[in-house]
Design a protein with these regions (language model features):
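Acidic-glycine-rich active-site phosphate/pyrophosphate-binding loop
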Residues: 152-166, 205-216, 273-278, 332-346
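Claisen-condensing/thiolase-fold acyl-transfer catalytic domains that form or cleave C-C bonds
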Residues: 3-17, 24-39, 123, 148-150, ...
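Short, well-ordered amphipathic alpha-helical segments that serve as non-catalytic structural scaffolds
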Residues: 85, 117-133, 156, 234, ...
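Conserved beta-ketoacyl condensing-enzyme motif
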Residues: 81-166, 172, 177, 316-332
Length: 401
């Protein structure tokens, strides 16, 4: 029997044993801050900032453009209206004017366009995040760059180091293939770095140009949904070690310092490669998006979140801020239901989905920026940042303001 012969879903549902439940109950009596202090895990998100393309369109205008393009192929144009009206998006930013996209004739052309726009947006986002953190370019010791919508060698991080004239001894890490989980995974890797180098500052940049991956000849339901959901943009965050911030490092006061990272967690779901990702061919990147994703979330996420919180001495009821990747209405509703969150707990995610669409790896950083700059929790509030992506996997970060 092959893997595809298994009835859906074929991934293992995570069950909490009696021993795990007892551990969760006992650990919940501890203080997460004390746990973090013992492990030396005091790192902070000094800032987060976005950079969006100048071309902004309403959902209706984008839908109309695709209906006109596919006029001869769509058997029921109203089906596209239905898909696009249900994804919770009002406006999206695109890297190029809509009429430009018809000029791209090959994967090589779209990838070259990705490199051009991604470098520009990435530089803007990094500079904005440094400015908010009260830092300058020489204060940056490590750079983590996440993107799943284009490829380059030398990679995008190398080009940004040249463009911004970052220090020549900067440590750089390009990350590809983790999709919507990328913003959270990048934050985790940056936190790992500054734990090892507590005097250092690291930047995580997530830049995605999803519009350049659209397959114009693909009328599958997954692609029809993708052209109504995904968008373009970038976001960067500065993660600082516990011993930064003295006069020789910080050149000016930060605009508004972000939360501390108290802990991180990763969950990998075996044999779930077909849930999300790319089917890459000579034509480019074709979306893979399984309708079984909400079911995976409902069956597994609550237990995984509870186990993660228990390792840090907390329960779900202790969390006052949920920073969730806005993957779409079905994803957000599945998260809301399985975690039994109060109404309004995911408002910032819904708002970012409405205003920007799904920016893949950058989206969760946009939600974090919105929380930090416009809805900052009270000091002492615990938060969870969570994103999921190809693998299939989930990445969780415990925050405290």
């Amino acid at each position: 029997m092959t893997q595809t012969d298994y009835p859906a879903p074929f991934w293992p549902t995570r069950q909490i044993s009696e021993e795990q439940a007892a551990f969760i109950e006992e650990a919940a009596d501890e203080k997460a801050e004390a746990v973090a202090a013992e492990r030396g895990q005091y790192v902070k998100i000094a800032s987060v900032a976005r950079a969006m393309p100048e071309h902004r369109y309403s959902q209706e205008s984008i839908t109309a453009a695709f209906k006109a393009y596919w006029l001869a192929q769509l058997r029921s144009p109203e089906r596209l209206d239905q898909f696009h009206s249900r994804v919770g998006v009002d406006h999206r930013h695109l890297a190029f004017p809509m009429e430009r996209y018809q000029e791209f004739a090959s994967f090589g052309e779209t990838n070259a366009a990705w490199l051009q726009a991604a470098e520009q947006l990435g530089a803007q986002a990094i500079d904005a995040a440094l400015d908010r953190a009260g830092l300058s370019r020489p204060d940056l010791h490590a750079l983590f760059v996440v993107s799943v919508t284009g490829i380059a060698s030398p990679s995008l991080d190398a080009r940004l180091i040249n463009r911004l004239r970052l220090r020549p001894d900067i440590k750089r890490t390009p990350i590809f293939g983790i999709g919507c989980a990328g913003g959270a995974i990048g934050l985790t890797r940056a936190a790992d770095y500054v734990l090892a180098y507590p005097h250092h500052n690291a930047a995580i940049l997530a830049v995605e140009l999803c519009s350049l991956t659209i397959q114009p000849d693909d009328l599958s339901p997954a692609n029809l949904i993708a052209v109504g959901l995904f968008a373009d943009g970038a976001a960067a965050a500065i993660v600082s070690g516990a011993k930064t911030g003295h006069p020789s490092t910080a050149s000016r006061a930060p605009v508004r310092e972000g939360p501390r990272i108290l802990g991180t967690g990763s969950v990998f779901y075996p044999d779930s490669e077909d849930i999300m990702g790319w089917d890459i061919s000579e034509k480019g990147m074709k979306i893979v998006l399984s309708p079984r994703l909400p079911e995976l979330i409902r069956k597994n996420l609550a237990g995984d979140v509870d186990a993660f919180l228990a390792r840090n001495g907390l329960r779900r009821s202790d969390i006052g801020a949920w920073v969730m990747h806005p993957g779409g209405p079905k994803v957000l509703n599945a998260i809301q239901d399985t975690l039994q969150l109060e109404d309004g707990a995911l408002d910032r995610s819904w708002d970012c989905l409405k205003r920007f669409g799904n920016l893949s790896s950058a989206s969760v950083l946009l939600v974090l920026e919105e929380v930090q700059m416009n809805h900052a929790p009270e000091p002492g509030t615990y938060g969870v940042l969570l994103a999921m992506g190809p693998g299939f996997c989930a990445e969780m970060i415990l925050l405290r303001w």
